[in-house]
């Protein structure tokens, strides 16, 4: 009976020790880190002119009808304004912003919102469609808080990460998760070595940063796998 008590006591100590060790790897809160990083993350909105052919008939075809596309080419071309949303992050105090190229591609006007309230016009100073990276310059003399960069090669599967961006136009949104996989290739571009995360990623997050727990950028949120988002690739 005495031996059983000793073994039971030892087992309880071991379970308690393992639980404490595991809990050290789980952040109690992301609040302090998010508060520090959010001023460096921006919301991007773009407008561009799109030319489409109109229906030449005075009546509308039923939605999804094959005749709708068939006869559109005979209609008169019509210009309309199209808008898009995305995210980005500041890499220099002089207002230099990095985002995805597909966020600003063919844009006529680019508006960048910083810290949730200040808006600035931006111009493209560099773009590479192959890597899907673009660099913007904010048209202002103000100083900003740039991000710090980490080493994505040191990021491990299972590490905690947070994504900050502008999903659905809801700026300043923070989500968290872990690195689910590395070295993903999904056929998006010539250069592919993506990190997969289960942090919630949705439309408008493109171009936003993926941070490690030290507050360093280790990736750019680029793509969503799945009909309803949530599986992030960057």
Regions found by a protein language model. Give the residues of each.
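Intrinsically disordered, low-complexity regions
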Residues: 1, 14, 64-67
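Bacterial N-terminal signal peptides that target proteins for export
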Residues: 1-8
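Bacterial N-terminal signal peptides
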Residues: 9-16
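Serine-dependent protease modules
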Residues: 22-234
């Amino acid at each position: 009976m005495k031996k059983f008590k000793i073994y039971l006591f030892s087992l309880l100590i071991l379970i308690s020790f393992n639980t404490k060790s595991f809990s050290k790897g789980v952040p109690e809160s992301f609040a302090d880190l998010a508060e520090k990083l959010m001023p460096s993350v921006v919301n991007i909105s773009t407008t561009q002119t799109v030319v489409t052919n109109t229906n030449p008939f005075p009546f509308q075809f039923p939605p999804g009808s094959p005749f709708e596309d068939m006869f559109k080419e005979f209609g008169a071309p019509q210009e309309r304004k199209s808008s898009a949303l995305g995210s980005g992050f500041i890499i220099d105090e002089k207002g230099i912003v990095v985002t995805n190229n597909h966020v600003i591609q063919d844009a006529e006007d680019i508006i960048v919102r910083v810290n949730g309230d200040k808006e600035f016009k931006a111009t493209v100073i560099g773009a590479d469609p192959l890597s899907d990276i673009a660099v913007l310059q904010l048209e202002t003399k103000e100083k900003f808080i740039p991000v710090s960069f980490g080493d994505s090669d040191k990021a491990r599967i299972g590490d905690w990460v947070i994504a900050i961006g502008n999903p659905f136009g809801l700026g300043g949104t923070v989500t968290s998760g872990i690195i689910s996989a590395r070295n993903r290739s999904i056929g998006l571009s010539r250069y592919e070595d993506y990190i997969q995360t289960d942090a919630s990623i949705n439309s408008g997050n493109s171009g936003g940063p993926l941070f490690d727990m030290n507050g360093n950028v280790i990736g750019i949120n680029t793509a969503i796998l799945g009909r309803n988002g949530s599986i992030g690739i960057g």
